[in-house]
């Protein structure tokens, strides 16, 4: 049947498809296209199937697209929207053969994601959740699709409410990376906090990427990263009184998922790395810990969490 009960026949020139594009450091670009521009209009014979399928393969669920989609009837001012609560391969699809339009989504299938699962008699399988909403325009929220997105994101409010008291509001965080280019020190932290003392600031985040670059290809091995941790802790200790005086909480930024090509872990502990087709998955100068490998988790627990606790 028709996805919009407000239109007759093929709902010509009034169905809009909303998706959200994404890539590294440029997440969240809303893309709106008409059903006609996506060639989601029926043929004269009503037998040819047309579909627009999109999604992501792997463990970065917002690479390419957000797991979100919406159809808007612009004449009626109504939006049907869906979001997947998913952190693995997923797909969504707008499908049309006749006057009706179907909107589906979930785990990536055999065609799109090279994945399938056989459920034997007596077995069960639980899929990730999908959050659905339908709404009309709302003056307070602006456009209809904005209001639909607001309704979808409010689904997670219950998880926010269950968080610690310190996370019941959105803290104002300052990342000093572009101020010191990853080489924080007691002196420049003092200068930063002096410069923002008239502002409300909750967290100052230290990024030691500059020191990381000096030993870059080996630093991410987390044995040599010990020195980065010690360096960061030393800066924090030196600046502790300044943080306390201005009631600002310090934080340290680390990326623990990869190793550099000159680190001994890169070549000596391939058993901890992600593999594909029997070989270690390797990019230009990095390899990646297999976060499903208990030995990799134990290694990181010791080298990162253990050293931070010290």
Label the model's feature ranges:
Residues 166-172, 200-202, 246-250:
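Short, well-ordered coil/turn segments that N-cap beta-strands
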Residues 1-97, 113-115:
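Polysaccharide-binding surfaces and accessory modules of carbohydrate-active proteins
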Residues 166-171, 178-185, 252, 256-309:
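Active-site-adjacent "subsite" loops/lids of carbohydrate-active enzymes
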Residues 12, 213-267, 274:
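Acidic/aromatic-lined carbohydrate-recognition and catalytic surfaces
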Residues 101-111:
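Short, structured beta-strand/loop micro-motifs enriched in basic residues and often containing a Trp
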Residues 117-136:
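Short Pro-Gly-centered flexible turn/kink motifs
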Residues 85-87, 132, 174-179, 208-211, ...:
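Active-site beta-loop-alpha junctions enriched in small/polar residues
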Residues 120, 188-213, 310:
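Catalytic domains of carbohydrate-active enzymes, especially glycoside hydrolases
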């Amino acid at each position: 049947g028709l996805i919009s009960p407000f239109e007759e026949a093929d709902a010509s020139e009034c169905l809009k498809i909303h998706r959200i594009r994404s890539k590294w450091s440029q997440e969240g670009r809303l893309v709106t296209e008409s059903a006609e521009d996506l060639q989601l209009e029926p043929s004269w014979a009503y037998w040819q199937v047309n579909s627009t399928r999109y999604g992501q393969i792997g463990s970065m669920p917002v690479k390419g697209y957000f797991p979100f989609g919406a159809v808007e009837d612009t004449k009626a001012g109504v939006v049907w929207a869906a979001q997947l609560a998913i952190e693995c391969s997923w797909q969504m699809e707008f499908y049309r053969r006749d006057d009706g339009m179907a909107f589906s989504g979930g785990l990536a299938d055999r065609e799109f994601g090279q994945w399938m699962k056989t459920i034997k008699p007596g077995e069960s399988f639980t899929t990730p959740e999908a959050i659905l909403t339908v709404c009309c325009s709302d003056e307070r929220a602006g456009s209809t699709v904005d209001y639909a997105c607001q309704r979808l994101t409010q689904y997670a409010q219950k998880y926010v409410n269950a968080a610690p008291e310190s996370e019941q509001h959105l803290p104002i965080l300052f990342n000093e990376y572009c101020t010191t280019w990853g080489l924080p020190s007691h002196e420049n932290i003092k200068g930063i906090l002096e410069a923002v003392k008239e502002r409300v600031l909750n967290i100052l985040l230290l990024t030691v990427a500059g020191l990381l670059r000096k030993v870059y290809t080996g630093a991410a091995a987390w044995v040599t990263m010990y020195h980065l941790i010690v360096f960061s802790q030393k800066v924090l200790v030196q600046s502790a009184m300044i943080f306390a005086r201005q009631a600002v909480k310090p934080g340290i930024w680390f990326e623990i998922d990869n190793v550099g090509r000159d680190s001994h872990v890169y070549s000596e502990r391939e058993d901890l790395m992600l593999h594909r087709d029997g070989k270690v998955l390797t990019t230009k100068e990095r390899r990646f810990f297999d976060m499903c490998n208990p030995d990799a988790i134990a290694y990181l627990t010791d080298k990162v969490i253990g050293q931070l606790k010290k």
